[in-house]
A protein has these predicted regions:
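Single-stranded nucleic acid-binding surfaces, predominantly the OB-fold ssDNA-binding core
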Residues: 1-208
Length: 208
């Protein structure tokens, strides 16, 4: 598979086989489906894929396991929410059960949250990174940084260019509605395992 430049994601997992027409753009049909990708911990990320009809055939639609290469994209919903998905550039059938999830991004930090600790004691910070693409469009992706990378993100400036390696994940959380009832929501985000900035070296951050 050919890798992309500043926005590259490879998912290998179990197809949910729930292909549905998503939209028509310039006369080309696009379909959506979900792929289940199991982590080493056993947790399953159910992730949305958008794919052109030109990449689909009967064998792919009926396959149990698929390998998909593409870009993480965002789309603003009419209700104010954001749809985050993998836009497929290439797709292949896996002949046996296999799981893989890797994201490589290069973009610019445009918003940072506050550092905090999880219930398990891990340090975490969330931030938004803008990924440029063709035709002056950008995707604004939510990213989580962990442990030593929390200080790293705190010490670099907004608009800094960063390179990120991690996984595309889904995460359930609960939110109260207007009647006070808890409703399950699903967040889609990038959980980073490695972050590098082109503006700061590690020595500069430690000594600064």
């Amino acid at each position: 598979m050919k890798t992309l430049e500043n926005n590259n994601c490879i998912l290998t997992g179990k197809s949910c086989k729930d292909f549905a027409k998503h939209c028509i753009t310039k006369g080309e049909n696009f379909y959506s489906f979900y792929i289940d990708v199991k982590r080493n911990s056993g947790v399953i990320d159910k992730l949305k894929v958008i794919i052109s009809e030109k990449l689909l055939n009967k064998d792919i639609i009926e396959a149990d396991f698929l390998n998909v290469l593409g870009q993480i994209r965002t789309y603003d919903k009419e209700n104010g929410g954001i749809d985050i998905y993998l836009f497929a550039k290439d797709i292949n059938i896996e002949k046996e059960e296999k799981y893989f999830n890797k994201v490589e991004l290069t973009g610019y930090i445009c918003k940072k949250g506050k550092a905090r600790e999880t219930k398990s004691g891990r340090k975490v910070i969330d931030f938004i990174v803008a990924i440029n693409r063709l035709f002056r469009k950008s995707d604004y992706l939510p990213v989580l940084a962990w442990n030593k990378d929390v200080n790293y993100i705190n010490n670099i400036n907004i608009s800094s260019e960063v390179s990120i390696v991690g996984r595309f994940q889904s995460r359930a959380y609960y939110k109260k509605d207007c009647d006070g009832n808890l409703i399950e929501k699903i967040a889609y985000e990038i959980s980073s395992s490695k972050i590098l900035s082109k503006e700061n070296t590690i020595d500069e951050l430690i000594l600064g």
